Amino acid sequence: MRWLAVGIGVAMLLGFVAYAQTNKTITMRDACDPDSFNAVVGPGTCVAGPHGNTLFNDFVGELQTDQIAGAWRFNPMLDASEGHFRLARLDLKSGDQTTIQNAGGETHSFTRVRKFGGGFISFLNDLTGNPDPAPECAQALPDGSLVPQPESDSNQFVEAGKTEPGPVAGSSALPEGVSRWECCIHPWMRMVVVVHEKHEKHD
């Protein structure tokens, strides 16, 4: 009986490890201050929570200086291991399930784009040096204004504090090979995802 119990325990442990290896969480982060963001942009833009307290004017100032706001990011986003910042890549194997968690106070999108570009908010595009919207993010209306593309498996919008299933690696939404992803609201939020075949080795 003791060995049976041990065997069951080992099987459960192996099952847990297998589960952990095939579920990857992509975290969206920001540090918006609810009072100042909601006063300028509109009610509900930033939801209160333990995500930070960057004032809207400071947020804009950082974008004017650096063309990014560092607290607004995907995790993983940046890799400084070689002494300079570069986009970190997320390695997955075909069949992996992704989960998208919004740990910030604003809504963010997780959108696959052919080429990194601007989003559907012209003001933020201009501040960050992204004058040309990624077509997967934005539609241009006859008057020149931008509206978001419809939500899809490769263009997911996640509200503040929410967690949603993301695309499955190897699916049409997240195909094998290299793909580029960005937030269509905050277009400096970017990441590269590489999906490998199940038995392919990678660095």
Describe the predicted segments one by one:
Residues 5-15:
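Bacterial N-terminal signal peptides
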Residues 19-203:
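Extracytoplasmic copper-binding redox domains, predominantly the cupredoxin/blue-copper superfamily
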